Amino acid sequence: MKLVLIRHGQSEWNKLNLFTGWHDVDLSEEGVVEAMTAGKRIKEAGLEFDVAFTSVLTRAIKTLNYVLEESDQMWVPVHKSWRLNERHYGALQGLNKQETAEKYGADQVQKWRRSYDTLPPLLEENDERQAKNDRRYQLLDTHAIPSGENLKVTLERVIPYWMDTIAPEIKAGRRVVIAAHGNSLRALVKFLEGISDDEIMELEIPTGVPLVYELNDDLKPVNKYYLDK
């Protein structure tokens, strides 16, 4: 059984080196090229899908659309869930990463970005950036909507979705592709590979490059490789 993971192509805020999180930004021109290239590589590798999953953020949705178009699989059913969103960067969203490091210190910013259980500064309740003000989240329990997340909290929303929704599709023999985000995918990879809290700090997933897992019957990885050529 194979599972394909794809981090969205470069976004406009990736290009500007800004903390993005749940803020909904589009792909950059380079990101579009990355997504299209990913689709072409998937087609060349002969990978076919029966069902696709993505977040409710434009950059991941568009990446998946380009991948399916370039691999001639636009008809594949797509399921969107906020549980596959990027981690919520709280009050850091919209800030420049370099300027934030200069203000708070590089070590502190590195902890906010890469530590498993260090929370970023949270959004204030009345902050206009609160996701509860976004129509796509209006059906959610307000208690489920974060004001900021670390990787641990992100994992706690990603893995139940994996267990309840995605894994049963794979076990039923359906071929799955997931287009999501750096940290929601890091959370899933941590779970699949049993990566420690410390080791996960070093894991970086490149934008727009398909990551292929070969899984056993227990959905444990027996092999993995990037389609980067």
UniProtKB/Swiss-Prot annotation:
Keywords: Gluconeogenesis, Glycolysis, Isomerase. Belongs to the phosphoglycerate mutase family. BPG-dependent PGAM subfamily. It is an enzyme of class 5 (isomerase). PROSITE patterns: PG_MUTASE. Pathway: Carbohydrate degradation; glycolysis; pyruvate from D-glyceraldehyde 3-phosphate: step 3/5. The active site is at residues 8, 86. Disulfide bonds: none annotated. The record marks 181 as: Transition state stabilizer. Pfam families: His_Phos_1 (PF00300). Transmembrane segments: none annotated. SMART domains: PGAM (SM00855). It catalyses: (2R)-2-phosphoglycerate = (2R)-3-phosphoglycerate. GO terms for biological process: gluconeogenesis; glycolytic process. Its EC number is 5.4.2.11. Substrate binds at residues 7-14, 20-21, 59, 86-89, 97, 113-114, 182-183. It comes from Listeria innocua serovar 6a (strain ATCC BAA-680 / CLIP 11262). One of its GO terms (molecular function) is phosphoglycerate mutase activity. SUPFAM superfamilies: Phosphoglycerate mutase-like. Catalyzes the interconversion of 2-phosphoglycerate and 3-phosphoglycerate. This is 2,3-bisphosphoglycerate-dependent phosphoglycerate mutase.
